[in-house]
Amino acid sequence: MEEYQVKIDTFEGPLDLLLHLINRLEIDIYDIPVAKITEQYLLYVHTMRVLELDIASEYLVMAATLLSIKSRMLLPKQEEELFEDELLEEEDPREELIEKLIEYRKYKDAAKDLKEREEERQKSFTKPPSDLSEYAKEVKQSEQKLSVTVYDMIGAFQKVLKRKKINRPMETTITRQDIPIEARMNEIVHSLKSRGTRINFMDLFPYEQKEHLVVTFLAVLELMKNQLVLIEQEHNFSDIYITGSESIHGA
């Protein structure tokens, strides 16, 4: 029986997930609370396993690294005596990870800046003159909303599992025959069309069955990947809303 696996391009690796957690939890990157970040990281990896997503081995390596750093942080600090009045403190176990995160953040920021500049150049060459007053209003409104990532969606799905009191991994294999993800995608699209308004992400999970919860989430991810839905969130930890894209309402 063929397994149904979903691999999301937005998963850029464990450093990307760690940066996401640091930003969302408003943590100082130079003073990472290892116990807290490890707990959140493992929760995300666990949720990805529940969903049977195609997880790269690097995520598991990072999990082991975080646990190692956490255990070293719990050990009593040792100081090596050099001279009578000089002591050398042991190296911070987080130092190497912090350096990697800072470098990765610089790379991400630079890539984002280049992409924005390229988009601006394309607009200046392709967009004809027009009245920008209404456009300015739309931009101002959109800037008030956060850019929702796949990691945000996984965090929202964690809330679903908690509300449904489902914490253990799936024991069954999701297959095309058992649970038609395409059919669930069509149901969500139909709901968006019939309502003509956005839907709260939590309202997509009316049933208790684990299989239905998982297939619904995977259906949303596929709709996101195919740009058939728009995802909105007003601020950190607030509710997430699903809106049909123009291609849905225009069909």
Swiss-Prot record:
Highest rank taxon of the organism: Bacteria
GO-annotated molecular function: identical protein binding
Keyword Cytoplasm (UniProt): yes
Pfam families named in the record: SMC_ScpA
Location(s) in or outside the cell: Cytoplasm
Biological processes per GO annotation: cell division; chromosome segregation; DNA replication
Gene3D superfamilies: 6.10.250.2410, Structural maintenance of chromosome 1. Chain E
The gene coding this protein: scpA
NCBIfam families: PRK00104.1-4 (NF000995)
Gene source species: Bacillus subtilis (strain 168)
Protein family: Belongs to the ScpA family.
GO CC list: cytoplasm
Keywords linked to the UniProt accession: Cell cycle, Cell division, Chromosome partition, Cytoplasm
Subunit structure: Component of a cohesin-like complex composed of ScpA, ScpB and the Smc homodimer, in which ScpA and ScpB bind to the head domain of Smc. The presence of the three proteins is required for the association of the complex with DNA.
Protein name as annotated: Segregation and condensation protein A
Task of the protein: Participates in chromosomal partition during cell division. May act via the formation of a condensin-like complex containing Smc and ScpB that pull DNA away from mid-cell into both cell halves.
